[in-house]
Amino acid sequence: GSTGPSSINPVNNRPYGSVFPNITIRDIVRAQAKVADYLGINKWHAIIGGSMGGMQVLEWGAMFPERAPRIAPVATSLAASAQQIAWSAVGRAAIALDPRWRDGNYYESDPGDGPHAGLATARAIAQIHYRSDASFQSRFGRDLVDKDSLFGLWDRFEVESYLDYHGEKLIRRFDANSY
């Protein structure tokens, strides 16, 4: 994004961290519209987006119907459901329980010394609820990473490897304060 929790707070010349102001989908769309204005784009041919991007698509349609005559929201809703709010709360709790969270003020720590374990756990939780049980069963079943293993205490299942992969991928590109 254009700015976020790692941006410098002009009040104290340090990263905002956990005191970064809350923003809404409407705020994001207003900012996008200003960028479009700056670029001289008065009307989009179509706007498409999935998940949180889909919420932005819906907001474009509500706020600027004349600028967004065709919208295609994918895998989204007008607002988060109670269940989605609950899943998000559990993910944020996983981040906050990481000892390297430091109340969201970890930007001045050594590189790589942020709440990566908590963020990876939050991502694993999210990945589980993004798919159905049938989808997990079809893709992974009970397959082990090491096919020659005898189901020992520390053997790893393919599904665990999948969750680890997505957690590692997220911590390389995402700020835990933005979760």
Regions from the language model: what does each represent?
Residues 1-55, 62, 66-78, 82-89:
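Gly/Pro-rich cap/lid or specificity-loop segments adjacent to the active site
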Residues 10-14, 103, 157-160, 175:
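A generic structural signal for ordered alpha-helices
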Residues 67, 73-169:
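Alpha/beta-hydrolase-fold enzymes
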Residues 167-179:
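Hydrophobic, aromatic-rich cap/lid helix
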